[in-house]
């Protein structure tokens, strides 16, 4: 029932955002009359033979399952067919090959998350030249001709994380941030976290710790930070690796810290559920998939009087013991 209501609201929002052209029905059309809403709604009834693909790298991980759930729900409600495929690792050439295979199927639209920001541009452009609608989600190809990019606003996510964690820590003291130094998404989260603290909690001192993109290195580096900073009161683990390594280092140290993770890997969700960490930040994975499908359908069927939004922030949610069960993959 919630998802049905969500779709109705999404449809209403789509109509208002895009000014769907089917509302301009001829006067003698059976759908004419009123404000044209009936005609516009009818345009959002698709054909089961129309196929829309989601393409990822590291296929099969929980993160993409949440994304595809959103796309699948939107596709089912619209009456079209949705399919998921992807490269099993982070090999760039491999994802290009998978995307080329999907294009060969001549789908109506493709939602793709890009393992590399530039390497898929030519392939995406080739799809567009064939009349296939393409949007990017989670990881962009900004130099390509993709129609829209749906992702987490990482700076805002960092601010939301600080707003949750800092009060748990009493509003002052040292908080460690464990993240991949140099990674654009993590750096933006740090920036947002720091900005919120500077504005709202000047008594917070931030200790930066590099997880180096490796679980072992992250655990070792966090352990060293705990030894060097005996007065740490909190820890924000800003990516999936940090979410595993950070709590491990804290547990091994025997110290009592308030801990906030990022993302909803099953391991992290289990830590929230058993009380090992306070909470985690869930990206809007379902929203990425849901709105990717809505955008693709809108463009592929010529329903928009306006260009799709170039960038869409799909939001984040704080996941605690109270709502953690909702985030396990189905």
Name these PLM-found stretches:
Residues 1-8:
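Bacterial N-terminal signal peptides that target proteins for export
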Residues 13, 20-330:
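A residue-level marker of the well-folded mature domains of exported/periplasmic proteins
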Residues 8-16:
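Bacterial N-terminal signal peptides
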């Amino acid at each position: 029932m919630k998802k049905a209501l969500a779709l109705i609201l999404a449809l209403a929002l789509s109509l208002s955002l895009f000014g769907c052209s089917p509302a301009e029905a001829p006067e003698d059309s059976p759908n004419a009359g009123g404000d044209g809403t009936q005609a516009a709604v009818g345009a959002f009834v698709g054909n089961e033979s129309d196929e829309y693909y989601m393409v990822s790298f590291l296929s099969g991980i929980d993160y993409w399952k949440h994304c595809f759930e959103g796309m699948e729900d939107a596709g089912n409600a619209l009456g079209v067919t949705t399919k998921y495929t992807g490269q099993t690792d982070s090999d760039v050439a491999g994802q290009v090959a998978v995307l080329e295979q999907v294009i060969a199927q001549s789908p109506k639209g493709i939602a793709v998350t890009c393992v590399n920001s530039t390497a898929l541009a030519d392939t995406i452009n080739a799809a567009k030249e064939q009349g296939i609608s393409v949007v990017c989600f989670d990881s962009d190809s900004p130099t390509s001709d993709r129609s829209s990019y749906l992702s987490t606003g990482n700076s805002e996510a960092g601010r939301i994380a600080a707003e949750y964690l800092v009060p748990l820590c009493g509003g002052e003291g040292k908080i460690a941030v464990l993240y991949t130094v140099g990674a654009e998404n993590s750096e933006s989260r740090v920036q947002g976290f720091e900005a919120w603290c500077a504005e709202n909690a000047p008594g917070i001192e931030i200790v930066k710790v590099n997880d180096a993109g490796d679980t072992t290195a992250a655990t070792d580096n966090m352990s060293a930070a705990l030894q060097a900073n005996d007065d740490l009161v909190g820890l924000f683990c800003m990516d999936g690796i940090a979410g595993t390594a950070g709590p491990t280092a804290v547990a091994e140290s025997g110290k009592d810290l308030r801990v906030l993770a990022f993302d909803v890997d099953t391991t992290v969700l289990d830590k929230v559920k058993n009380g090992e960490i306070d909470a985690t930040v869930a990206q809007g994975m379902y929203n990425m998939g849901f709105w990717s499908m809505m955008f693709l359908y809108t463009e592929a069927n010529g329903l928009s009087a306006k260009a799709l939004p170039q960038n869409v922030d799909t939001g984040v949610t704080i996941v605690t013991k109270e709502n953690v069960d909702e985030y396990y993959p189905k």
